[in-house]
Amino acid sequence: QINIIDAEAVAEYVKDNGIDLVYSVGSDLAMPTVAKVSEKLGLPHFVSYDTALTCNLKHKMRVALGNDFKGNVPFKVIEKLEDAEDFECYPAMMKPVDSQGQRGVHKVESFEEIKENFEKSMLYSKSGKIILESYLEGQEISVNTYVKNGKVIFALVSDRVSFKEFPGGIIKKHLLPTQFSKNVVEKVKDLVQRVLQKLEIKDGPAYF
């Protein structure tokens, strides 16, 4: 058994077994390891280690997009409760910066609700950091996309249905085809293209 976030152990296993390609199809958590090992051993890979890490850490992705990026939202990274006292962009989503599967995610309407849920979110943050993101009202969607030479060549937009009884937007199902108009879908594809360019993802699959 090898821990998938232990890049050194994975690299040794790859070398010892003459493996030609390292990839993960089921875990976001493994993608920085995939990129780091592939770079170290000169194996084929879609994105750099820096890009994989940025995509894996919510605060790094927000920073990489930049405050002037059309489609980004107001956000703040906090490590202690006092850091959130001047946050004003409510309602907001409170998330551990480095968790997956909606663990530790809560919608908050005030600083009082941040206090109520702070420790619950922090339980799932390995780095001890939480991000507050201004909440966007509306129908949720997902996008499965593939990019080649910096251009999106495939993008499938689906409607996302979340469990109402759980916090954090845990996905219940995806619906196809999307209910949105062709015009809206084209705007979504444009946003996806711009995000991929900002994150320097030039080849391979991506999911939003």
What are these regions (language model features)?
Residues 13-19, 87-88, 124-126:
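Glycine-rich phosphate-binding loop signature in dinucleotide/nucleotide-binding domains
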Residues 48-51, 176-182:
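A short acidic, glycine-rich active-site loop
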Residues 86-94, 154:
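Acidic/histidine-enriched active-site and ligand-binding environments that engage anionic O-linkages
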Residues 2-75, 79:
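Conserved N-proximal alpha/beta basic substrate-recognition cap immediately N-terminal to
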